[in-house]
């Protein structure tokens, strides 16, 4: 038994490229504790996003095991994985993936409605989070009417609306300038402290990564703890 919230054991991922087998990840062992913030860094194409997709149940490993609170998830079917993601995970990407025809409030409320909450209850929860991330004056604005930093704040609010245990963030500041990127990182740090949500943050920005509790380096398909 382990007290890890999310962990993997000897996780590997390979692809067929014509007649060749390309190995992206090799025997990854990783554990995330409740409330922990971990950065995963590495060169472009090193497999960082692939690792995040495997940990989030968005892709299947070629071999190895994935556990959530000591329950093995590797054999789960797609519908069970989808339900688990909706109840326990939040996702933030480099591109915000907001639905353009919906307002900020409607975008943030959507995961709540998918989880079965009434529209009224979902919008109340969404409004509280949008106020928390500093967008109380942007509730009715659509994504095209928001700045890049504001759109990413909406995406973060959406990731938190179902009170996830873990947020997986893939280059969450990749499309932002330095000042906006720093403000997004500070927001994630604050939410971690306030809500106890664990984070795995994939990033190429070493300066920002160093603000987190632990840095793991992915190189040649192998995950290494950064030596301080």
Swiss-Prot record:
CDD domains in UniProt: ABC_MJ0796_LolCDE_FtsE (cd03255)
Keyword Transport: yes
Superkingdom of origin: Bacteria
InterPro entries according to UniProt: AAA+_ATPase, ABC_transporter-like_ATP-bd, ABC_transporter-like_CS, ABC_transpr_LolD-like, LolD_lipo_ATP-bd, MacB-like_ATP-bd, P-loop_NTPase
Disulfide bonds: none
Cited PROSITE patterns: ABC_TRANSPORTER_1, ABC_TRANSPORTER_2, LOLD
Membrane association type: Peripheral membrane protein
Subcellular location per the Swiss-Prot or TrEMBL entry: Cell inner membrane
Cross-referenced Gene3D superfamilies: P-loop containing nucleotide triphosphate hydrolases (3.40.50.300)
Domain ABC transporter: 6-228
This enzyme's EC code(s): 7.6.2.-
GO molecular function, one term: ATP binding
Binding residues for ATP: 42-49
GO CC annotation terms, alphabetical: plasma membrane
Function noted in UniProt: Part of the ABC transporter complex LolCDE involved in the translocation of mature outer membrane-directed lipoproteins, from the inner membrane to the periplasmic chaperone, LolA. Responsible for the formation of the LolA-lipoprotein complex in an ATP-dependent manner.
Quaternary assembly: The complex is composed of two ATP-binding proteins (LolD) and two transmembrane proteins (LolC and LolE).
UniProt protein name: Lipoprotein-releasing system ATP-binding protein LolD
Classification lineage: Bacteria, Pseudomonadati, Pseudomonadota, Gammaproteobacteria, Alteromonadales
Encoding gene, per UniProt annotation: lolD
